[in-house]
């Protein structure tokens, strides 16, 4: 009997060790965008989740490698709170950020598991080129009667006038897009349908109604002025590899506390899409329920590798950016969000990683990050938030997990007892996050409180000073006077202009951030600064480029 027991224990130990060992599988680089690349490395095993993967990258033909952010460990899982239930595979996954368009890169991956299993691989992937007409494109003039006679490789310069409601019915080709362009902005449409089109670009027109992009591939909407209850829509089957950039999109909603929140009478979406590989950047969007939005539940196709970059967002009665149902490698970066109920929603993230980097948020009447419905895989880095109530508040009973929350600046503060849409902005803590999973990490964040004593709360643990706490070993408490001009939205019902939230060179957030390769390499002093900005550096462009 004793021998059998020993054998059983030995077999069990071997079995457990085998389950902890990592077996590398297939590597994919799905849906390259114009400036970012994704890597998905499927694995078997690693039940104890300690496998890591270092990343280096370089342009093809260059000698020197640059370090990337390590891939994130994504265990296989599912979300029982979605309809239908969504599942994801066991893998290491991540993004390489801010690359050159139309460029081939080598990505070197080094996998290591201390319990067994290691591999080194080099994969090649290319970013998409900027989606512009080719130099040898044929330029022709056109009016309403010419719209559906334009050929691939032609640019149709639209005459001024009223075009009514138009459905385009011709496709371009790879390298030969069809471009419809107004150089004056006076080609005016009641609405536009690009449904099921491929390689069609709409540029510089005015649309007093929706632009429909259902079923599109490689289509572009650029430098248009759109005024509508629903701006740009891409419902099932969604859009693939599209680009929506440099537009001004204005809705019908004002900054009205009576209609804020999920149950408010605030119907209307600025840019609402489903699909993968899309780039939504440098738009100015204001006056909607959700200014930028994914689709949810049964309305969502796979939403991977979508880039939401450098948008200027104002007056979102529910969410500034609704990144819900993002599956993996969606990137929400360098957006400015002002006067919204919620800044950014990830309700839920579906495995991830999904990245929220260097966004700036001011005057939010509920929360900065809505991580609900068991969101998984949110990576929240270098954001700046200034709001009445809790700086970072998350009050769900459906905890998020597998999140990395680092190098952020959260400023909360005194507020009245007012609620918005039935929800409170919080009591004024620097942070109040009530529930989160065992695989989350908070560290190197800075917290401040305006107009009341400092306090923070993580789970049931309340603290009145930093650093050296259980969940924030390197977090810091800072004063609210970090900026060149003292700013705080003490009246959330007021419509604020976006303030300058760059820190002073001598502020306590300077040089206090953790170094993260390919995320904060551009610091100019000893170390990166906490928050969205580096002190002394110009801010990025928000909204349409000159």
Regions inferred by a protein language model and the residue ranges of each:
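Recognizes extended acidic, P/S/T-rich segments that occur
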Residues: 54-102
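Right-handed parallel beta-helix
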Residues: 159, 177, 181-186, 198-208, ...
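Beta-solenoid repeat scaffold
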Residues: 129-132, 137, 151-204, 217-218, ...
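Glycine-rich beta-solenoid repeat tracts in large extracellular/virion proteins
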Residues: 148, 165-172, 188-196, 209-215, ...
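Acidic, glycine- and Ser/Thr-rich low-complexity intrinsically disordered tracts
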Residues: 154, 260-270, 399-546
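Solvent-exposed loop/turn segments flanking beta-strands in beta-repeat/beta-sandwich domains
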Residues: 44-57
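Extracellular fibronectin type III
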Residues: 112-135
């Amino acid at each position: 009997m004793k021998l059998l027991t020993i054998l059983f224990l030995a077999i069990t130990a071997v079995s457990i060790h085998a389950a902890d060992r990592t077996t590398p599988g297939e590597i994919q680089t799905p849906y390259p965008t114009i400036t970012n690349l994704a890597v998905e490395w499927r694995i078997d095993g690693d039940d104890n989740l300690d496998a890591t993967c270092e990343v280096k990258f370089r342009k093809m033909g260059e000698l020197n490698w640059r370090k990337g952010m390590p891939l994130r460990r994504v265990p296989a899982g599912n979300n029982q709170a979605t309809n239908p239930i969504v599942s994801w595979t066991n893998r290491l996954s991540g993004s390489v950020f801010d690359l050159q368009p139309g460029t081939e890169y080598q990505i070197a991956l080094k996998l290591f598991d201390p319990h067994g299993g290691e591999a080194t691989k080099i994969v090649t992937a290319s970013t998409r080129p900027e989606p512009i007409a080719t130099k040898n494109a044929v330029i022709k003039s056109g009016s309403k009667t010419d719209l559906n006679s334009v050929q691939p490789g032609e640019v149709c310069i639209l005459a001024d006038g009223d075009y009514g409601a138009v459905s385009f019915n011709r496709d371009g080709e790879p390298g030969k897009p069809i471009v419809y362009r107004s150089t004056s902005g006076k080609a005016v449409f009641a609405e536009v349908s690009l449904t099921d089109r491929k390689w069609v670009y709409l540029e510089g027109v005015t649309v007093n109604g929706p632009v429909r992009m259902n079923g599109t591939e490689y289509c572009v909407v650029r430098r248009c002025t759109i005024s509508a209850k629903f701006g740009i829509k891409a419902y099932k089957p969604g859009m693939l590899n599209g680009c929506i950039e440099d537009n001004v999109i204005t809705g019908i909603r004002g900054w009205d506390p009576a209609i804020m929140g999920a149950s408010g009478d605030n119907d209307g979406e600025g840019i609402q899409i489903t699909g993968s590989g899309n780039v939504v950047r440098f738009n100015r969007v204001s006056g909607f329920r959700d200014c930028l939005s994914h689709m949810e539940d049964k309305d969502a196709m796979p939403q991977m590798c979508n880039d939401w970059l450098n948008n200027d967002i104002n007056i979102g009665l529910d969410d500034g950016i609704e990144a819900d149902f993002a599956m993996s490698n969606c990137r929400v970066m360098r957006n400015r969000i002002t006067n919204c109920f919620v800044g950014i929603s990830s309700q839920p993230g579906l495995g991830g990683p999904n990245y929220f980097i260097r966004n700036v948020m001011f005057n939010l009447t509920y929360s900065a990050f809505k991580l609900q419905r068991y969101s998984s895989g949110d990576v929240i880095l270098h954001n700046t938030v200034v709001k009445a109530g809790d700086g970072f508040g998350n009050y769900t009973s459906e905890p998020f997990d597998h999140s990395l929350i680092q190098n952020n600046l959260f400023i909360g503060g005194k507020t009245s007892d007012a609620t918005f849409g039935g929800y409170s902005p919080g009591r004024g803590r620097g942070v109040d996050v009530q529930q989160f999973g065992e695989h989350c990490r908070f560290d190197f964040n800075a917290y401040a409180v305006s107009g009341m004593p400092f306090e923070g709360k993580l789970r049931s643990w309340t603290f009145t000073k930093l650093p050296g706490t259980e969940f924030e070993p390197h977090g810091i408490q800072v004063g609210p006077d970090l900026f060149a001009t003292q700013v705080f939205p003490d009246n959330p019902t007021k419509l604020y202009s976006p303030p300058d939230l760059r820190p002073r060179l001598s502020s306590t957030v300077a040089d206090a951030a953790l170094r993260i390769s390919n995320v904060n390499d551009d610091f100019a002093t000893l170390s990166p600064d906490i928050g969205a900005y580096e002190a002394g550096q110009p801010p990025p462009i928000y909204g349409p480029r000159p």
